[in-house]
Swiss-Prot record:
Its EC number is 1.4.3.3. Its cofactor is FAD. This is D-amino-acid oxidase. It catalyses: a D-alpha-amino acid + O2 + H2O = a 2-oxocarboxylate + H2O2 + NH4(+); D-alanine + O2 + H2O = pyruvate + H2O2 + NH4(+); D-cysteine + O2 + H2O = 2-oxo-3-sulfanylpropanoate + H2O2 + NH4(+); D-dopa + O2 + H2O = 3-(3,4-dihydroxyphenyl)pyruvate + H2O2 + NH4(+). D-serine binds at Y224, Y228, R283, G313. The keyword Phosphoprotein applies. It is found in: Peroxisome matrix; Cytoplasm, Cytosol; Presynaptic active zone; Secreted.
Length: 347
């Protein structure tokens, strides 16, 4: 059976790995391929700061709560493993800051040690009157994609650099199952009026004295439009740009100045930090992520398609739960083709 995953960001590679781990032993003739025109370090995943944190408001789809939890638990289970360094995985603590009180987030019991800030802590951030502190995880996209690629290569997965023009093209090429993980570019393969780019721009700096993340929130301006500072394994990410519908991949001087001014106001010592890089990427914004099966009619044959895209700015936060769900959908396809019998549920 030939399975083609389109897309080599965190969604595509994690989905491919989930399918390999669950079905390679029962499908001896599994021919799994990854098609993409961009591989690491040129994907949107490479641009992401990598902090595990969902949106503040609860998702419309209750399954997304479970997928977020599954991802956090999966990453946390690796935190003391020999793989953690290669994955770009580490614990990180920090602050979410607000001008005034807001409800607790739905994920407060997923992270470690969630609590409200004390008055003394808020004195450190005089422009803000309310906030939270907790410990989360950082998973750096560039390292993680390299680790996933290595795991897939060990399992015999083949990678092809090519620009796919349509799902039909892949079906005609002999794919039995197509897994569409094309993120913000999914609309080029199949029209999706709900999908839009959420352009972001970030500055990477060398600032090893920054030990805590600081995320600010301004409900009036909207998500990602106020300063944030996120320390990674080697570098610190500065951001605060979100432009819906903007496809411009070129770094903007105006956006650079907005980020720099906002982050240096939040943490004045950053003025002494050396800038080591600046990047632009696109969040695949959709009212609800798309994770479902579809049958594609090509000629006289039906090709199975699993869509897994539209994760907005939280792809790294929810990726493993979505990969597990996509693998489950793949298992149902195998069962219908009488190639696999699903294990009985113990619920």
């Amino acid at each position: 059976m030939r399975v083609v995953v389109i897309g080599a960001g965190v969604i595509g590679l994690s989905t491919a790995l989930c399918i390999c781990e669950r079905y390679h032993s029962v499908l001896q003739q599994l021919d799994l391929r990854v098609y993409a025109d961009r591989f690491t370090p040129l994907t949107n995943t490479d641009v992401a700061a990598g902090l595990w944190q969902p949106y503040l408001s609860g998702p419309d789809n209750p399954q997304e709560v479970e997928w977020n939890q599954q991802t956090f638990d999966y990453l946390l289970s690796h935190i003391h493993s020999p793989n953690a360094e290669q994955m770009g995985l580490a614990l990180v603590s920090g602050y979410n800051l607000f001008r005034e009180a807001v409800p607790d987030p739905f994920w407060k019991n997923m992270v470690l040690g969630f609590r409200k800030l004390t008055p003394r802590e808020l004195d450190v951030f005089p422009d803000y009157g309310y906030g939270w502190f907790h410990t989360s995880l950082i998973i750096e996209g560039k390292s993680y994609l390299a680790w996933l690629t290595e795991r897939l290569t060990e399992r015999g997965v083949k990678f092809f650099q090519r620009k796919v023009e349509s799902l039909e093209e892949v079906a005609r090429g002999g794919a039995d199952v197509i897994i569409n993980c094309t993120g913000v570019w999914a609309g080029a393969l199949q029209p999706d009026p709900l999908l839009q780019p959420g352009r972001g721009q970030i500055i990477k700096v060398n600032a090893p004295w920054i030990k805590h993340f600081i995320l600010t929130h301004d409900p009036e301006r909207g998500i990602y439009k106020s300063p944030y500072i996120i320390p990674g394994i080697q570098e610190v990410t500065l951001g605060g740009i979100f432009q819906l519908g903007n496809w411009n991949e070129i770094n903007s001087t105006q956006d650079h100045n907005t980020i720099w001014k906002g982050c240096c106001s939040l943490e004045p010592t950053l003025r002494n930090a050396r800038i080591v890089g600046e990047y632009t990427g696109f969040r695949p914004v959709r009212p609800q992520l798309r994770l479902e099966r579809e049958q594609l009619r090509v000629g006289s044959a039906n090709t199975e398609v699993i869509h897994n895209y539209g994760h907005g700015g939280y792809g790294l936060t929810i990726h493993w739960g979505c990969a597990l769900e996509a693998a489950k959908l793949f298992g149902k396809i195998l069962e219908e083709k009488e190639l696999y019998r699903m294990p009985p549920s113990h619920l």
